[in-house]
Amino acid sequence: GYYPFVFEDPHSYYEKVSRVIDKTVFEDIATYYNLKTPNLQYFKRLLTYLASIPPGDLNFHNLAKSLGVDHKTVEHYVSILASVGLVREMRPYEGGGPGLRKPSKILLNNTNLIHTLQQYLGHQPSKGMERELFFVQSLQNAGIEIFYSKQADYRTRKVIFEIGGKNKTRE
C-alpha cells in the first residue's frame, strides 16, 4: 500500500485511507486555507468525481455547473487538492503546438485513493485507470518530469509512452 499503516491491519486499510482523506479535507485544508465547512464538501465531491471518471475526462466548466460554483473556484480547489497531495495535475507537453492547450489532466495522487473512493461509490476501479495512475505516480515519485501528450498518453522530454490495455494497438 501507499500508506504505512497497510501492515497494521489490512482489513481496515481503506477505512484508514478514508480517514486520511477526511482529515486532510476537513481539518488541514480548512485550517490552512481558512475555508468554511460548507465549502469543504466540494473537495470531497471533487475527489469522488475524479475517482469515477477516466483520467483526463475532467471538464472544469461542466463540473462547476454540477457543483453550483464557477469554474475558477473548481480550478482553485483542484490546485489546493494538488498542494495537499490528494491529486496530481498533469500539464500538456508544449512541444506539440497549440492543439494541446487545454486544461490540465487531473489524477488522484495514488491508486489507494482510487480504490478507497471507488469502494465508497460501490464500484471497482478500471484496470486502465489504475495502470495510468501507477505509471504516472511511479515516474513522478522518481523525480521524472512527465506530461500528457496528444501523440500518446504521456511523455517525458525525450520519450513517448502509450499506456496499453487489451484494446490498444501499436499505432
Protein language model features and the residues they cover:
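A cross-kingdom feature that marks ATP-driven nucleic-acid transaction machinery
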Residues: S79, G85-E171
